[in-house]
Regions:
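Conserved class I S-adenosyl-L-methionine
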Residues: 7-17
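Glycine-rich SAM-binding Motif I of class I
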Residues: 19-23
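Conserved SAM/SAH-binding beta-strand->alpha-helix loop
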Residues: 41
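Conserved SAM-binding loop
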Residues: 48-49
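Conserved SAM-binding strand-loop segment of SAM-dependent methyltransferases
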Residues: 53-63
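A short acidic, Gly/Pro-enriched loop at the edge of an enzyme's catalytic core
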Residues: 64-73
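A short glycine-rich, Lys/Arg-flanked "PGG" loop and its adjoining helix->strand segment in the class I
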Residues: 88-100
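Conserved beta-strand signature within the Rossmann-like core of class I S-adenosyl-L-methionine
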Residues: 101-108
Length: 146
């Protein structure tokens, strides 16, 4: 597993979509943990709110507005399909919001985002073949400022 699940984790999910990963995160979280789910689509945000979990706050805005400090940040955002400036703004926001021992978990279907990730993070990756199509899971931690 890419993440340890101690009691009071502060978690963010970027691009929560229709809640497939969100439900799995909520199932793993302790009663004292919190989840901020970022979803830019108000239609999808409504579906997330329907999960009705008091530990979760749905934020209907772009992931570039991530702020505060998190222990774990999950992202399924298709980084390469985003405009360069937005991609950089999101990665900068993640870097700034990640606690000193925090973990950023990025799901991607290509390895072409590695140069972007490397500017901000030290990472290791794992191929998930059960996923269709197969995906890369990047487990990233902060390194010195870019």
């Amino acid at each position: 597993t890419s993440v340890e699940w101690p009691e009071k984790l502060r978690i963010a999910e970027l691009g929560a979509g229709d809640g497939v990963l969100t439900r799995q995160i909520l199932a793993q979280m302790s009663p004292d943990a919190t989840l901020d789910a970022f979803e830019i689509s108000s239609t999808l945000a409504d579906k997330l709110n329907a999960l009705d979990d008091p530990r979760m706050t749905v934020r209907t805005c772009s992931a570039e507005y991530l702020s505060g400090e998190y222990d774990v940040i999950f992202s399924g955002l298709p980084l390469l399909s985003l405009p360069t400036e937005l991609r950089e703004a999101i990665l900068r926001a993640v870097y700034n919001a990640l606690g000193p021992s925090g973990v950023f978990v990025q799901f991607q279907y290509t390895s072409l985002t590695q140069p972007d990730l490397s500017r901000y993070f030290t990472w290791e990756r794992q191929r998930v073949l059960k996923n269709v199509p197969p995906a890369w899971v990047y487990r990233c931690t902060r390194h010195y400022a870019p």
